[in-house]
Amino acid sequence: MILILHPLENLKSYISSRPPLVIFMVSVSGMAIAFLTLGYFFKMKEIKSPEMTEDWNTFLLRFNNLDLCVSENETLKHFLNETTPPESTVTSGQARSSTQTPQALEDSGPINISVAITLTLDPLKPFGGYSRNITHLSSTIFGHQIGLSGRDSHEEMNITFTLPAAWNSDDCIVHGHCEQVVFTTCMTVTAASSVFPVTVQPPHCIPETYSNASLWYKIFTTARDSGTKYAQDYNPFWCYKGAVGKVYHALNPKLTVIVPEDDRSLINLHLMDTSYFLFVMVITMFCYAVIRGRPSKLRQSNSEFSPEKVALSDA
């Protein structure tokens, strides 16, 4: 007995007689392609770890929401350019020692961490600048002002910006008004250790040797979060006769915690195996459709009502 196959006819019959199975095959094919693409994506792309919600990139980006006001009414504080002995400061390296437990970190008190960050000072029109050389800007904020939640939202944080060069009114006199200036500053944050992320830290700067000015003057600024602009008690003259400072942190890919390569390879393997299984299922169903075509009951019923049999019965 010779088996004669009509693949195209069988496939057409299968599609017309079994639409639900055809839709199922298309859906499974789409899932297989999606898993295959996703597996390739996990293999080739570095993925941010979902387990680590806060790293130093996200932490420093929080300061972008701050507005600092450098007012003419603030009192300047003069201090000497003296290097602080290493023994008198709790460094970030000590605070992040792997031998310390979380409880020990909480009991160690406030720590200082200094990182380089961009500070923009945008003087308003009435602002006339300072005759003294301003080398430091200092402010005190609370955790909720930079979007921290829970217990950290009530933590007090002292921020000090060390300017690489003195900021004074010399340029204001030359131009007739004070223009916007941009500094790459050394920002020192003093706060409880629980406020800081426990991930890889950015490169540190040394405030004591950052500025090249011989005389140091510090000015205290007030800070507010950007959400205050939309509050009902917003004061449009909040920084009248002052300069508005904005902090800007550029993303550093080295600070982002990524999924380890071994984990990504394992994810890729599972996704590939799943996609291969789905492809085999689709190919099997396709071969069945090519060989069998429409159901046998449907073929039998059609043969019973074929034109030849109808003609013979009429005769």
UniProtKB/Swiss-Prot annotation:
TM helices/strands, residue ranges: 22-42, 180-200, 271-291
Bilayer disposition of the protein: Multi-pass membrane protein
Family as reported in the entry's similarity comment: Belongs to the TMEM248 family.
Annotated InterPro entries: TMEM248/TMEM219, TMEM248/TMEM219_dom
Localization: Membrane
Region ranges (Disordered): 82-106
Keywords tagged on the record: Membrane, Transmembrane, Transmembrane helix
Protein name stated in the entry: Transmembrane protein 248
Principal location listed in the UniProt entry: membrane
Gene name for this UniProt entry: tmem248
A cellular component term, taken from the record's GO annotations: membrane
Pfam families hit by this protein: TMEM219
Sequence ranges of Polar residues compositional bias: 82-103
Annotated source species: Xenopus tropicalis
Superkingdom of the source species: Eukaryota
